[in-house]
């Protein structure tokens, strides 16, 4: 079996475990593609992506085209003569001309069990919709949105305490073995492809900040899922008077309530109990504007009184 010349394309932290594995494998990681540096933070200073930082630390050449609409960027990739391109959360659309450059094509590590949750936010949508399991799919890329033939899947349970952050970390780590297995299969010309059933496809649209506001007229379970799906970003919130109150952790209870959804039923060391469309939700960790995340217990001990029984959260 021949060693493969690999080009990697990715931007956020999700791809780092696979990069660590690639550089220790028998294959040759020739270059890394990542999105251009972006302004970030209060100072709006240019910030390198986690993938770029990794590549610099490992002395791997980095390429950061704005897109692949110009021929120069396409020619630059072609000159690397990759056998395969591994794409993980790159964030740029790859046109047909790019997909055809690697001898064995471009393969994508996608954070869902395709064809369920094609699109930009599969992890958040798995939690939002109460999926019992999630996983990663290694697929051959085509010009569609996560529509290509599948090479490998790995599954894991989604627990009742999983947040988008914890599920992200689990899937990032578990993607390593299936990726290496697929590379070995490609190198030995033994890869097997399974077409996706488009009739089973669901789409995970991009999550935005406007969706983060809690609707207390939903059920306690639905609100709990939203809080977990929107942690660590953009973080679900409600209005306590005129203050934005971010909710980082909560759980649905079996306590029935006939009060108006959004009414605070009780605040004690266990948390803040809030009425919903059915059972009450126990809010455990909160964050006021300009303050740190704090448990309701610690907030109570600080002597503050903005949250109290009878308060209507909006």
UniProtKB/Swiss-Prot annotation:
Catalytic activity, per the record?
Answer: L-methionyl-tRNA(fMet) + (6R)-10-formyltetrahydrofolate = N-formyl-L-methionyl-tRNA(fMet) + (6S)-5,6,7,8-tetrahydrofolate + H(+)
Q: Which residues are involved in binding (6S)-5,6,7,8-tetrahydrofolate? A: 112-115
Asked if the keyword Protein biosynthesis belongs to this entry, the reply reads yes
Q: Provide an example Pfam family for this protein.
A: Formyl_trans_N
Might you report a single GO cellular component term? cytosol
Record's superkingdom? Bacteria
**Which EC class is this protein assigned?**
transferase
Gene Ontology molecular function: any one: methionyl-tRNA formyltransferase activity
**Keyword terms of this UniProt record:** Protein biosynthesis, Transferase
Q: What is its EC number?
A: 2.1.2.9
InterPro entries, per the entry: Fmt, Formyl_trans_C, Formyl_transf_N, Formyl_transf_N_sf, Formyl_transferase-like_C_sf, GART_AS, Met-tRNA-FMT_C, Met-tRNA-FMT_N
Which function does this protein serve? Attaches a formyl group to the free amino group of methionyl-tRNA(fMet). The formyl group appears to play a dual role in the initiator identity of N-formylmethionyl-tRNA by promoting its recognition by IF2 and preventing the misappropriation of this tRNA by the elongation apparatus.
Family named by the database record: Belongs to the Fmt family.
Q: What is this protein called?
A: Methionyl-tRNA formyltransferase
**From which organism does this entry originate?**
Legionella pneumophila (strain Paris)
């Amino acid at each position: 079996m021949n060693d493969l010349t690999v080009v990697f394309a990715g931007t956020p932290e999700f791809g780092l475990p696979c990069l660590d594995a690639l550089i220790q494998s028998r294959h040759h990681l020739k270059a890394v593609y990542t999105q251009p540096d972006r302004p970030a933070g209060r100072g709006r200073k240019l910030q390198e992506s986690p993938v770029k930082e990794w590549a610099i630390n490992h002395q791997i050449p980095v390429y950061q085209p704005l897109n692949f609409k110009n021929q120069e960027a396409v020619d630059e990739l072609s000159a690397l003569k990759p056998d395969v391109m591994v794409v993980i959360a790159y964030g740029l659309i790859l046109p047909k001309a790019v997909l055809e450059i690697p001898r064995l094509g471009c393969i994508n590590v996608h954070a869902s069990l395709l064809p369920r949750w094609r699109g930009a936010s599969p992890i958040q949508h798995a939690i939002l919709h109460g999926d019992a399991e999630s996983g990663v799919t290694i697929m051959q890329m085509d010009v569609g949105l996560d529509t290509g033939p599948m090479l490998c899947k790995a599954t894991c349970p989604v627990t009742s305490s999983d947040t988008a952050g914890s599920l992200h970390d689990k899937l990032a780590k578990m993607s390593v073995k299936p990726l290496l297995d697929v590379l070995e299969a490609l190198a030995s010309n033994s890869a097997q492809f399974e077409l996706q059933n488009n009739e089973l496809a669901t789409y995970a649209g991009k999550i935005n900040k406007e969706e983060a506001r809690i609707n207390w007229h939903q059920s306690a379970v639905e609100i709990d899922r939203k809080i977990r799906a929107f942690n660590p970003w953009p973080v679900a919130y409600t209005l306590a008077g005129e203050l934005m109150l971010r909710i980082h952790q909560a759980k649905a209870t079996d306590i029935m309530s006939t009060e108006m959804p959004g009414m605070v039923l009780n605040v004690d060391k266990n948390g803040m109990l809030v009425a919903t469309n059915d059972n009450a939700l126990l809010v455990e960790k909160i964050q006021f504007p300009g303050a740190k995340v704090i448990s309701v217990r610690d907030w109570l001990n600080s002597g503050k009184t903005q949250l109290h029984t009878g308060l209507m959260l909006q």
